[in-house]
Structures are given as C-alpha cells and as structure tokens.
Design a protein with these regions (language model features):
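N-terminal beta1-alpha1-beta2 submodule of the flavodoxin-like/Rossmannoid cofactor-binding fold
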Residues: 1-89, 99-100, 162, 166-172
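Structural beta-sheet core signal
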Residues: 7-9, 45, 92, 121-123, ...
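Soluble non-cytosolic domains of exported or imported proteins
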Residues: 24, 28, 99, 127-131, ...
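C-terminal lid/capping helical subdomain adjacent to the catalytic/cofactor pocket in oxidative enzymes
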Residues: 40-44, 93, 152-155
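A short, structured active-site edge motif that brings together acidic residues
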Residues: 49-51, 121-125, 148-154
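Helix-loop-strand module that forms the ligand-binding subsite of alpha/beta enzymes
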Residues: 55-145
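Glycine-rich phosphate/pyrophosphate-binding loop and the adjoining helix
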Residues: 145-173
Length: 173
C-alpha cells in the first residue's frame, strides 16, 4: 500500500533575509522547498496561512515572531483541513524563526491527532540550521514518529531541488 503523503508549509513573503541583505520576495524559500518535496513524492500540499498575516517588513516580522515565541502563542490558521487522518506521512516545512519553528506550525499540529503519523521536518534558515525546532517539535508532539529533518539554506532553496527531492524520497522509504 502506498503512503498517503501531506506536505504542509509556512513560508514568509515580503522582506526576507539573505546573506547579501534584505530582499523582497513574492514566494518564500520554504514554499520553494515544499514544492520540491511535493514534486518528488506526490501527495497533497497545504500552505499554512495565519488569519492575521505577519508583517511583510523584515524587522517587524522578527518582532512578531519573537513575541509569539515568548508568549507561546498559537496564531489562528486560515482554512484548516477538516481532517488529516488519511495521511500517514507529513512533511512539516518551515523557516527557522527565533531558533525554532514558527508558532503557526504548532497551531496547525495542535489541531490534529498525530499518533502514529510519520512527521518529517524541513527547516529553511540562513546559517542557524534546524535550531531547536526538531527537539521542540518532538517534545510537543511525542505521539508522532519523527524522522530526521533537513536543513536548507534559504537563499539556496531554489537551487536545491535535487537534494530536497532525494532526501524526501529517502525519508518515505
């Protein structure tokens, strides 16, 4: 029986940090990476969008993210799926914000019973790797079966299709 795969992602649009400075993007680095996963392994793709959008201005967005982490916030998500029960494998894609996953990722995961589901994280960043996100997610959702994640430099996401695709295929085998 073939695995039922869901790739979820949160990706920031607007001003984004790159090694050579702040740039304005219409498509975030994490969205690019999530699309590569979807292309490689199929299944369904779901973008996590908050009811109250994050600022498109880099510094304001950083302050919003820090405030959410500091208060353990769970921002409301738009258009949540009624159920994720058909899926046994879920790729969880996010940028490293304040050393962990954005709190909207937790908002999504809090909504569902993850018992026995295989969760596979992918984290975009500009040098901080996965940060504490893998540990934090495993601690918050211990009933899931967590697989080793992949750290992708955000500015290299667009040129990482082969690496991401091969990792995704290996992760579900």
């Amino acid at each position: 029986m073939e695995a039922m795969i869901l790739t979820i992602y949160f990706s920031h649009k607007g001003e984004t940090y790159f090694p050579d400075g702040i740039k304005n993007v219409d498509k975030g680095n994490t969205e690019i990476a999530a699309e590569y996963i979807h292309k490689a392994v199929g299944g369904d793709l779901f973008e996590i969008e908050t009811v109250k959008p994050y600022s498109g201005e880099y510094r304001k967005c950083c302050a919003e993210a820090k405030s959410e982490v500091d208060t353990n916030a769970r921002p409301e998500i738009k258009n949540l799926p009624d159920s994720i029960s058909p899926y046994d494998t879920i790729f969880v894609c996010y940028p490293n914000w304040c050393g962990t996953a954005p709190m909207c990722i937790m908002s999504f995961l809090d909504t569902y019973d993850l018992s026995g589901k295989k969760l596979i994280p992918l984290c975009t960043n500009e040098g901080s790797g996965m940060g504490n996100s893998e540990r934090d997610l495993k601690n918050l959702y211990p009933n899931a079966i967590w697989k080793e994640g992949l750290s992708v430099r955000g500015h290299q996401a667009a040129n990482s299709e082969d690496v991401i695709g091969e990792w995704a295929k290996k992760s579900i085998s």
